[in-house]
Design a protein with these regions (language model features):
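Transmembrane helix-loop-helix hairpins at membrane boundaries of multipass inner-membrane proteins
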Residues: 1-7, 19-102, 106-117
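Hydrophobic, membrane-inserted alpha-helices
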Residues: 15-17, 97-98, 119-126
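Alpha-helical multi-pass transmembrane bundles of energy-transducing inner-membrane proteins
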Residues: 26-34, 125-179
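Residue-level recognition of transmembrane alpha-helices
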Residues: 9-13, 38-41, 93, 119, ...
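Residue-level signal for helical boundary/lining positions with a hydrophobic bias
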Residues: 9, 79-80, 130, 139
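Hydrophobic positions within alpha-helical membrane elements
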Residues: 18, 88-89, 139, 148
Length: 179
């Protein structure tokens, strides 16, 4: 299989987030175009990941669907691959995101479009973490995932959302520096 399927499942949510960004905001804050695009993107990505899970050879314990691209003068390689454990985490991520989108439609009262963008971008980074075979790329995806999580907690969180967002960001950032 020559098609870069792991890159596709990683960046499809990011493309969906771009389309959600391009939708026109409506005055009633229930941007149905953004909702439909988010649901469509996340469900399509889930079914593609189901296909990958079905296609993986479960008798092989080595990495499969390996993609490798030189990135920074051969020092850092953009290398993706999955094994039996990582595909389960990717599948779980792709299963949870549509549920989050459906549940947030009525519970998020302000800036629903921005929330959906943050959720799709977060899906991209989480899947990137589970597909990465290069330590630098893994670290970049992991750290980049802090940004949408910080926004989700800080804008749409509970009563002490700003305090919680900064604590989450600092503890996770400082903890990952040791990696």
């Amino acid at each position: 299989m020559n098609f870069p399927i792991l890159s596709a499942i990683t960046f499809i949510p990011l493309i969906g987030a771009l389309f959600v960004f391009l939708t026109r905001s409506e005055k009633d804050e229930k941007n149905s175009g953004a909702i439909y695009i988010s649901i469509f993107t996340s469900i399509v990505n889930f079914f593609i990941i189901l296909f990958v899970w079905y296609s993986i050879d479960k008798t092989i314990s080595d990495f499969q669907f390996i993609e490798e691209y030189n990135w920074i003068s051969g020092f850092i390689k953009f290398k993706f691959g999955i094994d039996g454990i990582s595909i389960l985490f990717i599948l779980l991520t792709a299963f949870i995101i549509p549920i989050c989108i459906f549940s947030c439609i009525n519970s998020v009262k302000t800036r629903l479009k921005e929330f959906l963008i943050a959720l799709l971008v977060l899906e991209t980074f989480i899947i990137g973490v589970f597909c990465s075979l290069d330590l630098v790329i893994f670290y970049l995806f992991f750290e980049a995932g802090l940004i949408p999580m910080f926004l989700i907690i800080g804008i749409w969180g509970g009563p002490r959302k700003v305090y919680s967002a900064f604590k989450f960001f600092l503890f996770t950032l400082l903890g990952s520096v040791l990696m």
